[in-house]
Amino acid sequence: MRPSALVAKKTNMELVNKDFEILTDYILTFHFYKYLNIDLIENWAIELINSGYESEAIYNLACFYKPIDSHEVQPYLEAVLSELNLTTKNKEESQKSHIRYFLNKVAKHDDVRGNLKRMLHLYCDFDVDKDIIDLSVLDDAWDDLIAGQVNWYYKDVSLDTIEQEVIVMAQKWLYEN
C-alpha cells in the first residue's frame, strides 16, 4: 500500500472511530431525552459487533426491528451498558452529547438544515453557550430567507451562503468542545 493510501485509510478510520464515539455518547443520553432517536440503538449494537464486541446482550440489542419501542429496548440496552462498563450521561453531559451528535452530522454536510433543527429542538431545555445561541439565530435567519423576508440577523448571509455558515459554526463548536 502506498504511504498516501495508508494515511488516507488511517484518517478514515479515525473519522469512523470519532463517529462511533459520538454515537455512543448520544446513546448514553437514553434516560434524559424522550426525543432520542431510539432506532439508532440497533445501529450502535451492529457497530459494536462490527468492531469485534461479542456477547448475547449485544446480539439481542442488534435484533430489534425499527421502529424500536423505548420501554421494550431499555432492559437490553442497560444490560449492554453494564457489560461494557458504560454509564449513562448526567444532564449536562447529555446536553453536550445531544448537541455534538447533530452538529457532527451538520459538519459532514448531512441534511444540514434538518440536523440543525433537530439539535435545536430541545434548545429551551439546554444551558447553552453563545455558539449555540448563534446557531439558533442562524436558523431563524434561514427561515426568514426561505420565506422571502429580510434577514436582520446576519447581513452578509444569503440563501446561497447560509448553509455553509452553519457548517462552519458547527465545525467550530465541535473543535472547541
Model segments located where?
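Acidic, Ser/Pro/Thr-rich low-complexity regulatory regions
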Residues: 10-177
